[in-house]
Amino acid sequence: MRPLTMSGHFLLAPIPESSSDYLLPKDIKLAVLGAGCVGKSAMIVRFLTKRFIGDYEPNTGKLYSRLVYVEGDQLSLQIQDTPGGIQAQDSLSQMVDSLTKSVHWAEGFLLVYSITDYESYQSIRPLYQHIRKVHPDGKAPIFIVGNKGDLLHARQVQTHEGLQLANELGSLFLEISTSENYEDVCDVFQHLCKEVIKVHRLGGERRRASVIPRPRSPNMQDLKRRFRQALSSKAKASSALG
């Protein structure tokens, strides 16, 4: 099931060897969070390379960087892959200690669970609540992703449960198969990038609106011209009196 579909061009561009060749765009910083073995690393690599790799060593928080084009705009995208040892029974303090740095750093979030692992689904709510605690203004976009949608025979989390949770939290929900559908994976990251860009633009508009324009100060040429005009007027007045 795909509750959301996106269209438009979204192309990967290699990172230049020398950053001096480019005027680097504003960074977009995303974090992918979730329990272990839900496919976070596979999602990121699938998006960046179009390749699906099923088995990964437990990660310790790898950071991926790419220049990408979103609807014709070049952006510097960074994606933080987070450690996956978080389960619903873990204490809040354990979760905060392991993820707070990434949550503070990122501007947009993917919360990933596996439809074959109900405990990974249960970890989504505390992750969401922690993000909102760190970003209390509620502006940071958060998407909930049910991964491994191709493993229907092993499903433990129904689609309506993902939708219900997303509705309760006020988040967007997608159910995808990283292994079978690259386009769905691309749509997830593409749409999240667009939401982060939207937040940036709204913030910029508010800052511009709050700035009071300074009165234009006369420059030296203006002052000289006015001085000459004053002298000329004074001379004409003197001649008329004589």
UniProtKB/Swiss-Prot annotation:
One Pfam family linked to the record: Ras
GO terms assigned for molecular function: G protein activity; GTP binding
Chain residues that bind GTP: 34-41, 81-88, 147-150
GO cellular component, one term: nucleolus
NCBIfam families for the chain: small_GTP
Assigned protein family: Belongs to the small GTPase superfamily. Ras family.
UniProt name for this protein: Ras-like protein family member 11A
